[in-house]
Amino acid sequence: MVSASGRRVLVFNGEIYNFTELHAELEQQGRAPAWRGHSDTETLLAAFEAWGVEQTLKRARGMFALALWDRQNRTLTLARDRLGEKPLYYGWQMQGQQPAFLFGSELKALREHPSFAGEVDRSAVCLLLRHNCVPAPYSIYRGISKLMPGHYLTLTEADLQAQRLPASTPYWSLAEVAVAGVAAPWQGSDDQAIRELDALLRDAIGQQMVADVPLGAFLSGGIDSSTIVALMQAQSSKPVKTFSIGFDEAGYNEAVYAKAVADHLKTEHTELYVKPAQAQAVIPRLPTLYDEPFADSSQIPTFLVSELARKSVTVSLSGDGGDELFCGYNRYQMTAQLWNRLGSLPLPLRRMLAGGINLLSPTQWNQLARKLPGAGSRYVNLGEKLHKGAGVMGARSIEDLYLGFVSHWPDPASVVIDGREPPTLVTGNRPDLRGLDGVQQMMALDALTYMADDILVKVDRASMGVSLESRVPFLDHRVVEFAWRLPQSLKLRNGQGKWLLRQVLYQYVPRQLIERPKQGFAVPIDAWLRGPLRDWAESLLDESRLRQEGIFQPAAVRQKWNEHLSGKRNWQHWLWDVLMYQAWAEGQKK
């Protein structure tokens, strides 16, 4: 869209939720153009004209990737939303003799340009093996970067002529928000905090419910999605459309909990029980959906619930972000507790303990766990957890311990031929988080990396793949900033995370419908790889094929594959990383 003055041109992907407020502010200041319509795009353009780039970005609330061309100054500005809900790729490419600066919210668009070289960056493959995704600012292609969340990048005409890439500029920083919040914590009472969070979430959800197309929500029956749906229903005169999927496999089905919450809130609920064959049929579509290799296997149920929702609605709200903001992941407590116990033990003794754990396979530990009194959900996947713990007993600090828990392949450069693992916010270029304790640092790093590069990527690509727009109310920056001001006692109390968020939810949903062990959104990839997916995986992991392609060390991959097939170890996550790269690379040949 071209601005009313004709000076600026905007290419925009996303939504500005407070555009009516910006529209009114422009009117009040006498800086509004002669409006041609009522869109957020036109309002955003007018805001750029009136307030400039940085002030407009600071005022806007939404999810977006945008490019703004200033015809007068001949500058190009790229910008991305605060938390990274929408992707933005950019970089110089030269195939043949013609260099070009390329940018877009999809790699598919860049690949269509004649100057696009398409050379795989082996450093990015190393990152994939550690994190199951390629974190910003890296991409799978050499010379192409992702703009960091909360940043903008301005290229002058001189930059474009000299083929330079200036550094990007932050207009909002989650790390700074975290440090400032911990330094000046909330001073109110518990009841005041409950009321404040309720009001903030209501407003964020209310703004994101504004749509001229059918709207609904994903509902798993967990704390986060149930809170979103409860506050949607509280503001709606009609039943909210909610969606969930279920699996018949024990330990993987949350649909029964979602239905109980939906029945209580009286939503218009749709559920689909997915057969293994239906879930497995999604796998060939994943490389196209995700643009670059992406190996979080919960991408499968995420796509399926998006596909289900799209049959009824065009926009769906999700509960992503609650774990990182309100201390929801079990690993936060587990890592801190484990370090408190292990930190005082001599390193040789810890290594002996690890060796003892590894004497039994995860399957054998699970069999023993089922014989313990009160087994049930308390010891689900105990073997995998023990082996994960054994793998990090050599940690020399709580930071090393955290890295061990969030890593798949511990030394990716030894698996990727000619690969060198570059630093990330987790492994080297850590942000300044002074004043935060160990648990708070893990929460901040998760929000900066795992949430931005895994969770939000998973949801955005899966939903956009079926033309469904996903919105994430927890990531309204006002909610994020308030969450970081909350003392840890309002997040973690009596050994339970999300204390404050639970209190908000209990105003709408009885606690007996919510209180249960955290389950996650997973599929039984480990069993599928030994069963119906075995031939597909064997083809992609064929030793001669790996040797010919020259990306992965065949011996390292085949060892994991053989141990997995035998049941000796569960290497599903490690193998899924390699398989998703292989499937993606195969798709690029077509």
Feature-to-residue mapping (PLM):
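Cysteine-centered catalytic environments shared across enzyme families
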Residues: M1-Y290, T302, S306, Y506-Q507, ...
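Alpha-helix capping and helix-loop boundary segments enriched in small/acidic/polar residues
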Residues: E249, V274, P293-D296, S344-L347
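Conserved short loop/turn motifs at secondary-structure junctions
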Residues: L219-S220, G246-F247, D323, L468-E469, ...
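Adenosyl-5′-phosphate
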Residues: R31, E112, R142-M148, L165, ...
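Short low-complexity, flexible loop/linker segments enriched in glycine and/or proline
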Residues: P284-T288, R310, Y332-M334, W528-R530
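DNA-processing P-loop NTPase/helicase core
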Residues: Q367-L368, V380
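A conserved catalytic-core signature of glycosyltransferases
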Residues: V11-F12, A124, E196, A295-I300, ...
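Active-site adenylate/phosphate-handling loop in enzymes that bind or generate adenylated species
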Residues: R82, L304-Q364, S397, Y450, ...
